Amino acid sequence: NRVRRRGVATIRGMMALAVAALAVTALTVPSTSEAGMQRFQWQNRPLLVFAPDGDDPALQRQLGIADSHAAGWRARDMVTIVVAGDRPVTVDGTRAKDLVNDALRQRYRVTGDSFAAILVGKDGTEKLRHDAPISADKLFRTIDAMPMRRREMREREG
């Protein structure tokens, strides 16, 4: 019986530690709203592109993909959010005063010296992440497989 009680106490202690760790994480990682991303929820599918600076070759390649597939971007309600170096954040090339570089880097856990392309769904959750540019084909296949996108396509057809 004593062994069983010790085991239960250990499990309770581990659970308390896990809850405390989650609470600390919740306090240190900005939420979607704190990072300024709530304005896109249920409206757009953001592709966040993080780069060490604006001249980063991977950033330029990802922007080229977006430009050359603009019709597909629009059809899927996509926007491109660029977080490059310490420059102001842009949405589709326009400065976004409500989006803060550091808050986005912290929210999506991307360091200042790395490249990352992150697709966020209309529900505000991360759908795809790569440390290299993502092809339009991969982005479109990922989005087109989403239940919300399928519903949108059916509604546009009917």
Give the role of each language-model region.
Residues 3-158:
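Non-catalytic interaction/Regulatory regions outside core domains
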